[in-house]
């Protein structure tokens, strides 16, 4: 016998048929209230049919699935007992969710202002705790609008992240000051230049900037030196700036002290932990990039060249008003996937089995970074499926091990140990697992770090990497140390069959004993498999910000659906 459970998630109500022998209490979160009937015995068997959903409906259903069951979603074509509709309030009688994941309702969060003042206070607090001047002033500059060399065309503009973090302002040629004792944030934007208006239209006005940004005052850039002089004379204080980001026309002469070493590390440290608004931006970037990844999966079987699929991804992002990419897309078919940062994206697609797509858009200076590997024609061959399952297991286990305070080095080690077990099972590696780990032989297949912080930069600040590490397993690990709550980190294990990397191991007297070259020969054509999600670290665990399909049945169904 089954019953219908009603669950409300983000203003929409789901009807789910569940097994009658269900004990909800052990697995529902505290925020869920159940109707007071006797507990049942087992978890519900939840099945989801996504085929008729809009993109928003799919997102809601995925939210529900992630929160209420650990079972993966089945293929989209399967009929299931799952239904979706809006119910009147009087019919919502089983349970409802009263709170959400952090910034899960990102559209609502982003209706507010970017929290520039909160960031400024956070940076000032760090400076003061390090012995800085509590009466000081922070000064930052936006990126200058530049022309391409030898012509009058404008170069692509990318806002300075240090400036944006304390302003939320995307305008070039701007300045800001933050007076620490007065908690006063002032933005300086370019004035109206009549000749420029002829070509580019009216720029943002001072009043518009005051309304848009989380600032206390706004002036034009003509006022910056007068403002700095008045601030320094009134406080006889210290100016904090980034030396290589101070224009020649700016004067700090009237300040008692000029401090050029603390501000940059202060901002880099503070950027590691994210506000709700920042998390909302990363969620939105992930949602847009997910739609683009799905579009590529659906287009893959008919593509003739990697560049066609890169175009599909870019088109999907731009259609959703995400015109900037967080990094150059990697669209690698077959053995091209063995090159970690392959960016040529111009090779023909013919007999290759796999496509590795590492691509993510940027939303208001915040990045997404997603990698999916899938069979171009919708069917894995034996070798590629075996490697894919190992990498997927690496990612699942590593994500499940995460929470605030976890040592990232240990998660990276876990990924290698899972890879070793999988490669031993396939016969690619041979011998004792511990001996293979100690010899670092698995680095031949997994040479990069497990992940990196994500935020305004794809490889975000604060990771404390040690690229001089003599231990090859950790040399390219971009994050060292423990993970703080509210940091966002990528988890991107991979296994690659790159001759340039592996062949030296086959010639090494100490390490060659661990490789079966005859078995290895069957796997060169796999190229590389990488799976990457963006993970928010919480006190008790994680929230996965990346809803992009990755289970075998999901991705094969999407490719075949074309």
UniProtKB/Swiss-Prot annotation:
Its EC number is 3.4.11.9. This is Probable Xaa-Pro aminopeptidase PEPP. Belongs to the peptidase M24B family. SUPFAM superfamilies: Creatinase/aminopeptidase, Creatinase/prolidase N-terminal domain. Catalyzes the removal of a penultimate prolyl residue from the N-termini of peptides. Coiled coil: none annotated. Keywords: Aminopeptidase, Hydrolase, Manganese, Metal-binding, Metalloprotease, Protease. InterPro entries: Aminopep_P_N (IPR007865), Creatin/AminoP/Spt16_N (IPR029149), Creatinase/aminopeptidase-like (IPR036005), Pept_M24 (IPR000994), X-Pro_dipept-like (IPR052433). Mn(2+) 1 binds at residues 369, 492, 532. Mn(2+) 2 binds at residues 358, 369, 532. It catalyses: Release of any N-terminal amino acid, including proline, that is linked to proline, even from a dipeptide or tripeptide. One of its GO terms (molecular function) is metalloaminopeptidase activity. One of its GO terms (biological process) is proteolysis. Binds 2 manganese ions per subunit. Its cofactor is Mn(2+). SMART domains: AMP_N. It comes from the Eukaryota.
């Amino acid at each position: 016998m089954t019953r219908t459970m009603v669950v409300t998630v983000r203003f929409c109500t789901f009807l789910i048929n569940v097994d009658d022998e269900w004990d909800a209490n052990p697995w529902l979160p505290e925020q869920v209230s159940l109707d007071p009937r006797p507990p049942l015995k087992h978890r519900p068997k939840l099945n989801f049919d996504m085929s008729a959903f809009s993109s928003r409906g799919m997102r809601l259903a995925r939210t529900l699935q992630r929160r209420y069951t650990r079972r993966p979603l089945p293929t989209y074509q399967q009929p299931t007992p799952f239904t979706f509709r809006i119910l009147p309030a009087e019919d919502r009688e089983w349970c409802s969710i009263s709170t959400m994941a952090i910034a899960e309702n990102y559209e609502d969060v982003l209706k507010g202002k970017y929290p520039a003042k909160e960031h400024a206070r956070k940076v000032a607090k760090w400076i003061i705790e390090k012995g800085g001047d509590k009466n000081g002033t922070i000064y930052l500059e936006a990126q200058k609008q530049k022309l391409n060399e030898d012509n009058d065309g404008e170069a692509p503009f990318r806002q300075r992240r240090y400036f944006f973090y304390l302003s939320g302002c995307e305008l070039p040629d701007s300045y800001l000051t933050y007076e620490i004792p007065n908690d006063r944030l002032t933005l300086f934007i370019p004035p109206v230049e009549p000749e420029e208006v002829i070509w580019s239209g009216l720029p943002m006005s001072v009043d518009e900037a005051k309304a848009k940004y989380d600032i206390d005052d706004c002036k034009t850039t003509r006022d910056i030196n007068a403002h700095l002089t008045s601030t320094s004379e009134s406080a006889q204080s210290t100016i904090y700036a980034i030396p290589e980001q101070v224009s020649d026309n700016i004067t700090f002469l009237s300040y008692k002290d000029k401090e050029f070493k603390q501000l940059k590390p202060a901002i880099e440290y503070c950027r590691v932990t994210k506000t709700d608004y920042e998390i909302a931006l990363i969620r939105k970037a992930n949602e847009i990039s997910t739609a683009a990844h799905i579009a590529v999966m659906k287009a893959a079987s008919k593509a003739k060249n990697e560049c066609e699929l890169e175009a599909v991804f870019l088109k999907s992002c731009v259609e959703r008003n995400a015109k900037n990419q967080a990094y150059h897309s990697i669209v690698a078919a077959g053995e091209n996937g063995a090159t970690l940062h392959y960016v040529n994206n111009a090779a023909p697609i013919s007999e290759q089995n796999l496509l590795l797509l590492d691509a993510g858009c940027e939303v208001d200076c915040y990045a997404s970074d997603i990698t999916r590997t899938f069979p171009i024609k919708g069917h894995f061959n034996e070798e590629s499926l075996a490697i894919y399952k190992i990498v997927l297991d690496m990612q699942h286990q590593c994500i499940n091990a995460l929470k605030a305070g976890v040592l990232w080095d240990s998660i990276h080690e876990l990924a290698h140990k899972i890879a070793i077990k999988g490669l031993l099972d396939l016969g690619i590696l041979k011998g004792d697992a511990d001996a293979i780990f100690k010899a670092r032989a698995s680095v031949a297949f997994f040479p990069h770090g497990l992940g990196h912080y994500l935020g305004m930069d794809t490889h975000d600040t604060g990771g404390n990497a040690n690229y001089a590490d003599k231990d090859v397993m950790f040399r390219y690990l971009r994050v060292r140390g423990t993970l703080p709550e509210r940091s966002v980190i990528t988890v991107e294990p991979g296994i690659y069959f790159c001759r340039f990397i592996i062949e030296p191991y086959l010639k090494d007297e100490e390490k060659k004993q661990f490789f079966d070259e005859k078995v290895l020969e069957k796997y060169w054509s796999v190229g590389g498999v990488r799976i990457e999600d963006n993970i928010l670290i919480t006190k008790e665990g994680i929230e996965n910000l990346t809803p992009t399909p990755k289970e075998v049945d999901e991705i094969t169904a999407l490719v075949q659906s074309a």
